[in-house]
Amino acid sequence: MIYREQYEWDSEKEALNIRKHGLDFDTAILVFEDENYIEWYDAAHSATEDRYNVLGMVHDVLFVVYTERRDRIRIISARLATNQERRLYFHDYHS
């Protein structure tokens, strides 16, 4: 179950994300309800803070980037998964 108070994000960043990817962050946090979601540390983008990538199913496979701040999950970006990411999700899900 998603508790909204566990999550946070910058509203301007969300507005940019909606314009660019058509996806709001209230929808993005639903990836964490997918019992088959895949998560990994993103070393390449973690110079200033630890970032994580998540693939999860919310009507379609979504790719979400987040960090942890003050015991909350802070959403950085969200979009539909690429074809390669979808293959990774379905391969891991069915393995």
What do these predicted ranges mean?
Residues 1-95:
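Ribonuclease/tRNase effector modules and their secretory precursors
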